[in-house]
């Protein structure tokens, strides 16, 4: 909450928020860098080591300070559809809350360790996109879907793993 309150102290930020439409996006820096739900922090700067608890607190603050509540179907859920008349549906995704533990992201078969989007969110996206009559359908993702983001020399941080067979989080 303190970080959100700090931003609101800036008059320019408040003016922008009052004048510019915004779709708030949830990612890792609301909690800790590159987090996943089952993570236990080894960083001594944190008195709370459970990332799941930190993420729950961050999620609550996010929804208290960011313009999301109007579209939420379920309290605390980040993924949602934002419609702008008959022309545009924006599908806002959450690539943090449903992901498996960070790994080398090179698994050959789909399994619990390759989760990225989460089965429920994927089913929701498919259903909502099929039911959408909007001319334009935009997926707003907090991480690049098809861009390679290296995590060391051999692993990749997001969903894409480069050329070759489907591996790791690409299964989602």
Positions of PLM-derived features:
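Metal-dependent phosphoester/phosphodiester hydrolase catalytic core
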Residues: 1-172
């Amino acid at each position: 909450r303190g970080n959100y309150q700090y931003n609101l102290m800036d008059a320019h930020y408040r003016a922008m928020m009052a004048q510019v439409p915004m779709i708030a996006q949830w990612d890792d820096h609301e909690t800790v860098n590159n987090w996943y739900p089952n993570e236990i922090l080894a960083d001594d700067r944190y008195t709370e080591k459970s990332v799941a608890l930190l993420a729950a607190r961050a999620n609550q603050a996010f929804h208290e300070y960011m313009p999301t509540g109007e579209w939420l179907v379920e309290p605390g859920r980040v993924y949602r559809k934002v419609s702008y008349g008959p022309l545009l549906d924006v599908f806002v995704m959450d690539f943090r809350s449903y992901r498996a533990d960070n790994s080398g992201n090179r698994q050959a078969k789909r399994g619990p360790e390759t989760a990225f989007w989460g089965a429920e969110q994927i089913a929701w996206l498919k259903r909502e996109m099929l039911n959408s009559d909007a001319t334009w359908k935009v997926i707003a993702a907090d991480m690049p879907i098809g861009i390679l983001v290296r995590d060391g020399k051999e692993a990749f941080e997001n969903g894409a793993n480069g050329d070759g067979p489907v591996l790791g989080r690409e299964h989602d």
